[in-house]
Regions:
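Local sequence-structure signature of Cys/Sec-based thiol-disulfide redox active-site neighborhoods
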Residues: 4-32
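Short, well-ordered coil/turn elements that cap or connect secondary structure elements
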Residues: 6, 31-33, 88-89, 112
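Stable alpha-helical elements in mature extracytoplasmic
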Residues: 18, 25, 40-43, 76-80
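Sec-exported extracytoplasmic/periplasmic mature domains
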Residues: 27-34, 49-53, 69, 85
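Generic structural signal for residues in well-ordered beta-strands
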Residues: 36-38
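Structural microenvironment flanking redox-active thiols in thiol-disulfide oxidoreductases
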Residues: 41-53, 99-104
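Thiol/selenol-based redox catalytic cores and closely related redox-interacting motifs
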Residues: 56-136
Length: 136
């Protein structure tokens, strides 16, 4: 497991204690070198409200970087790293809405739903950051 320091990407992951797919996503992120701080909540509505995450962008867990960027849902760790290299102006993070099959933590054999990773902006508008088929 990576150690926290100034050079490592650190995410605080807000999740419910009983969500197995969130635990699988955390394992994926840790294996990619991301330091994870887990925060369990019985209800995530207060977290989603605090960070002003539009319901159309929501998923089962919310990750926050030490710089305040939001990563909502089952986003591939490499995509998070790519975004953080050059965040879009006025963006607040990325979202994979829902829980698409084949996204990290949602693996089901070889099945892979086509899904998009969205950039979400301060005004809660969004645009496509990339398609799942473009994730290497």
């Amino acid at each position: 497991m990576p150690l926290a320091n100034e050079d490592n990407l650190t995410l605080t992951v807000h999740k419910t204690p009983f969500c197995g797919c969130c635990k699988k996503w955390i394992k994926h992120a840790r294996e990619a070198g991301i330091y994870i701080i887990e925060k369990d909540h019985q209800n995530l509505n207060a977290i989603k409200s605090e960070y002003k995450i539009n319901p159309k962008h929501q998923s089962c867990h919310t990750s926050i970087s030490k710089d305040g960027y939001i990563f909502e849902g089952h986003i591939h760790a490499d995509v998070i790293k790519k975004y953080l290299e050059n965040p879009s102006e006025n963006s607040k993070g990325l979202s994979v809405p829902g829980m698409p099959i084949g996204s990290p933590g949602m693996e089901m054999g070889g099945r892979l739903d086509d899904y998009v990773v969205l950039t979400i902006f301060e005004d809660n508008k969004d645009e496509i950051f990339l398609h799942s088929r473009d994730i290497q």
